[in-house]
């Protein structure tokens, strides 16, 4: 409703964009350190100048509004700068998964219409291979820019084509007085993030300036990142634009500690050296920390908040992290929700619970993130909202300002994902009476044994409490009698011993018998670069195993 005397004008409406975070920090925190990577350091004033020059250079290279610029790099300074430099040129940033091979990168470059690709020296051959594939197929090949190792400039001109540009060449060719291109509509796209990439239908999730702005501020507020935090980059910057924290840390003038290789030793060393206040990562990073050798561990210099997500963390792992002194924040979301879509906000009344119970409460996925207005559990067939009884399982759905614009060049997939005015996550969960969501499984991961649903997450959480278990993943294994049974893939801690029979018995003592695994496979777990276990690989292995019923095992 428009009221008499009110108007919408440039005086009271400016499109929201994370670009404004950098503009402000370059003034307010001009001389504060923005980026640290070994001996390489920049201030916020320097960072903005470099980002403006990158935008200028991209414009000179023919990049204009709506074009796509890709980057294939780990957590290095260039990744921070490109998150601003690219949108300052009016373009979309596409951050590629560093575990992709040349053929998949080529698919994504073609699908996104990438015009320039920045490639870290460690992944240069992959980028060059992708460009060669495009060339051989007659597709337009993007301009390739090399990002050398800033600490050593490890790739010399003699070892590559003289025609290939280097990152610092791009910065140098840009002009510091370039007029930054800002969105005319805050719903304009700022980035595209690929959830998967098959040769038939890669899914490019499109983020808007508005969504990125709102989720960045929400992440800062909800994870208690007060003025000038020091953030250690242990979660991949390429994943959901670093859960929007690349922009969020900028908004409050924080310091980005860049980490190329994530190891337990590097984590403790950097926390100690730089007085880290915040960090994040998947449960695999938590496991790395709690199982680090004593020789690599160091006392925390102060409060270190750890934001975990990407996969449901076992309560036992959260408990161990807090024993080490970390303050845990648990979020849940998807690429389609800009990363975090919920957070398990702590309630004061839980303070009196035993520590183990507190960890269980914190392991729940929680309530909606700020900016994401509503989260429900619905029946995927009737689309009715299910009761908040902590028992009735349905599909988790979202709606709000931090849900993606849609899937790039895939209107049918967008329409399907948004049916009924909600984004359908594909995750199965329950809502508790207090309004908190708890995941039970991915819809494709639920195990149906003898007509009963088995939550792989519950079985995994039980296995994680065994003192010998380092990692565990549970999938369905075909069975002639039951239809499916739980099959656990387990990695034991170094020096530990446990038999399959022991672990099965351990689970049966703590779970209904039908939920306990009927088979255990000991091996390393395949993972994505974001730390998620690749269950599709394990499902294939489980299907290849001989059905237990054929061996005459007990059906009890």
Swiss-Prot record:
Record has Ligase as a keyword: yes
Keywords in alphabetical order: Fatty acid metabolism, Ligase, Lipid metabolism, Peroxisome
Chief location category: other
Any GO MF annotation of the entry: ligase activity
Substrates-to-products reaction catalysed: butanoate + ATP + CoA = butanoyl-CoA + AMP + diphosphate; hexanoate + ATP + CoA = hexanoyl-CoA + AMP + diphosphate; pentanoate + ATP + CoA = pentanoyl-CoA + AMP + diphosphate; 4-methylpentanoate + ATP + CoA = 4-methylpentanoyl-CoA + AMP + diphosphate
The keyword Lipid metabolism is assigned to this record: yes
Domain of life: Eukaryota
Pfam families given in the database record: AMP-binding (PF00501), AMP-binding_C (PF13193)
Similarity comment: Belongs to the ATP-dependent AMP-binding enzyme family.
Protein's recorded name: Butanoate--CoA ligase AAE1
């Amino acid at each position: 409703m428009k009221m008499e005397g009110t108007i919408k004008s440039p005086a009271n409406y400016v499109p929201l964009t994370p670009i404004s975070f950098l503009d402000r920090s370059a003034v307010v925190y001009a001389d504060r350190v923005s980026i640290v990577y070994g001996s390489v350091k920049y201030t916020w004033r320097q960072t903005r100048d470099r980002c403006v020059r990158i935008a200028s250079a991209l414009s000179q290279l023919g990049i204009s509004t709506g074009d796509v610029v890709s980057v294939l790099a780990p957590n290095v300074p260039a990744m921070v700068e490109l998150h601003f430099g690219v949108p300052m040129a009016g373009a979309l940033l596409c951050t590629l998964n560093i575990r992709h091979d040349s053929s998949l990168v080529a698919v994504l470059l073609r699908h996104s219409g990438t015009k320039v690709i920045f490639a870290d020296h460690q992944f240069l051959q992959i980028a060059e291979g992708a460009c060669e594939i495009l060339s051989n197929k007659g597709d337009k090949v993007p301009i390739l820019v090399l990002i050398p190792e800033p600490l050593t400039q490890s790739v010399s001109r003699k070892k590559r084509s003289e025609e290939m540009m280097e990152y610092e060449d791009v910065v140098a060719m840009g002009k510091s007085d370039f007029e930054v291109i800002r969105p005319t509509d805050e719903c304009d796209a700022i980035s595209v993030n690929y959830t998967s990439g098959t040769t038939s239908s890669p899914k490019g999730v499109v983020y808007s300036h508005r969504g990125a702005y709102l989720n960045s501020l929400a992440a800062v507020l909800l994870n208690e990142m007060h003025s000038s935090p020091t953030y250690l980059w242990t979660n991949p910057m390429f994943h959901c634009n670093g859960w929007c924290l690349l922009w969020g840390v900028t908004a409050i003038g924080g310091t980005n500690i860049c980490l190329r290789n994530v190891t337990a030793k590097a984590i403790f060393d950097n926390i100690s050296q730089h007085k880290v206040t915040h960090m994040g990562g998947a449960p695999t990073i938590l496991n790395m920390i709690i199982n680090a050798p004593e020789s690599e561990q160091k006392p925390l210099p102060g409060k270190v908040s750890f934001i975990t997500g990407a996969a449901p963390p076992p309560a036992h792992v959260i408990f161990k992290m807090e024993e080490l002194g970390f303050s845990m924040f648990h979020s849940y979301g998807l690429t389609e929700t800009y990363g975090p879509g919920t957070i398990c906000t702590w309630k004061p009344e839980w303070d009196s619970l035993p520590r183990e119970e507190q960890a269980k409460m914190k392991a729940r996925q929680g309530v909606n993130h700020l900016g994401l207005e509503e989260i429900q559990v619905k029946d995927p067939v009737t689309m009715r909202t299910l009761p908040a009884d902590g028992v009735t399982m349905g599909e988790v759905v979202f709606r709000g300002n931090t849900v993606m614009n849609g899937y790039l060049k895939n209107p049918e997939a967008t329409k399907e994902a948004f049916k009924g005015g909600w984004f359908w996550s594909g995750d199965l969960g329950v809502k508790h009476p207090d309004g908190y969501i708890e995941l039970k499984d991915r819809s494709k991961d639920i195990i149906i044994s003898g007509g009963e649903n088995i939550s792989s997450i519950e079985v995994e959480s039980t296995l994680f409490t065994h003192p010998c278990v380092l990692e565990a993943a549970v999938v369905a294994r075909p069975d002639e009698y039951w239809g499916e049974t739980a099959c656990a893939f387990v990695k034991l801690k170094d020096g530990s011993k446990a038999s399959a029979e022991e672990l099965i018995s351990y689970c049966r003592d703590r779970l209904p018998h039908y939920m306990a695994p009927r088979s255990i496979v000991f091996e390393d777990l395949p993972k994505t670069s974001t730390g998620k276990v690749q269950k599709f690989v394990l499902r294939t292995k489980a299907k290849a195993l001989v059905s237990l019923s054929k061996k005459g095992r007990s059906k009890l």
